[in-house]
Amino acid sequence: MGLLLLETFGPIEWILLTVWILAISAPIIYSLKNKTPVALGISVALLLGYIVQYSWVVMRNYQIDVNFVWADFMLIPTRIDSPTWLHTLASAGFLHSQSDVTHVLGNVLVIALVGIPLEQRLGTNRFIAVYILGLLGGSI
């Protein structure tokens, strides 16, 4: 159902997408490897991912021809019935509006202030399970 825009990406789009994937995955992987709170890693991942997303806006403002990189990772309910788009159930949780920073800052504050103590009480594995359920539940 629908064409993936990834097929039309040039070098700039691939670089931006790669940096975004690294920005959202590296802090979480780091926290798992170093036994630091995963909630903190998620908070950092959300902030770094947003910074990379916002760099797309900056490029567009300087008339750099960049396709909308995030379209294949946004959750659009009408296309979720196709296996091609199942990845959006998870990726949408790390995408935020480039025009309103308050949403991502609110997410970061809640995850940092509530998530870290919750992770300490539940344990890392249970916290990850709760977070993934919330991530998927928020996408349904």
Where are these regions (language model features)?
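N-terminal signal-anchor/start-transfer transmembrane helix
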Residues: 15-31
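Select subsegments of transmembrane alpha-helices in polytopic membrane proteins
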Residues: 11-14, 128
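Membrane-interface helix caps and helix-loop-helix hairpins in membrane proteins
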Residues: 30-33, 97-98
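Short, strongly hydrophobic alpha-helical membrane anchors
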Residues: 1-11
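N-terminal TM1-TM2 helical hairpin plus the immediately adjacent luminal interfacial "cap"
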Residues: 38-140
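Short, aromatic-rich membrane-interface segments at the entry and exit
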Residues: 13-16, 34-40
